[in-house]
Design a protein with these regions (language model features):
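A structural boundary/capping signal
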Residues: 23, 28-29
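Intrinsically disordered, low-complexity acidic/polar and Pro/Ser/Thr-rich regulatory regions
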Residues: 16-23
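Carrier-protein-dependent adenylate-forming modules in NRPS/ANL systems
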Residues: 1-15, 30-172
């Protein structure tokens, strides 16, 4: 303290003894532990187990509960796997901002693939270039966006026309 070091500048004197300093800086301020990283599709699955009837997504007048979102994503993921797409395949998604878009994103992730977002508001020529550059293994589209990819080599999957097939797929 000041008695032991009278020539020391006040700004250099310790304000706390070693025990109090330890308490304030270490004991009361533990290092933050890193939050566990979970991919978004696993977070949605956990939420579906916790709150199955809670609304998960609402858009375009449609509302899906967590259970419905999880079920539809699982069914589409099984359909994607049935197509024989390799793990890590790039799958384009060109859908309007409706619940089906989120279902598609989750399904692609559940299938072990990577999704390539394609904005349906882009001009068809731009979408074609983006799809070609991405070297897509498949494209998830609907009746409206299908026409943008008529000349693409990628496998087109029109999800609004697959409802009967999807209904036969496993839900988990």
């Amino acid at each position: 303290g000041i008695v032991a070091q009278p020539e020391q500048a006040v700004s250099r004197l310790p304000l706390l003894d070693a025990g109090r300093r330890q308490q304030l800086l270490a004991d009361w301020n533990p290092p933050a532990c890193a939050a566990a990283f979970l991919p978004v599709h696993e977070v949605v699955a956990a939420n579906a187990r916790r709150w199955p009837d809670a609304p998960a997504v609402a858009a375009g007048g449609a509302v899906l509960s967590y259970a419905q979102l999880e079920t539809r994503a699982n069914q589409l993921a099984h359909q994607l796997l049935a197509q024989g797409l390799p793990a890590g395949a790039r799958i384009g998604i060109c859908l309007p901002r409706e619940p089906s878009l989120l279902v598609a994103v989750l399904a692609v992730l559940k299938a072990g693939a990577a999704y390539v977002p394609l904005d349906p508001d882009y001009p068809p020529a731009r979408l074609a270039v983006m799809a070609a550059d991405a070297d897509l293994a498949a494209l998830l589209v609907d009746a409206v966006t299908r026409g943008c990819f008529a000349d693409q080599g990628a496998h087109l999957l029109q999800i609004d026309a697959m409802q009967e097939e999807l209904g036969r797929c496993p839900t988990s």
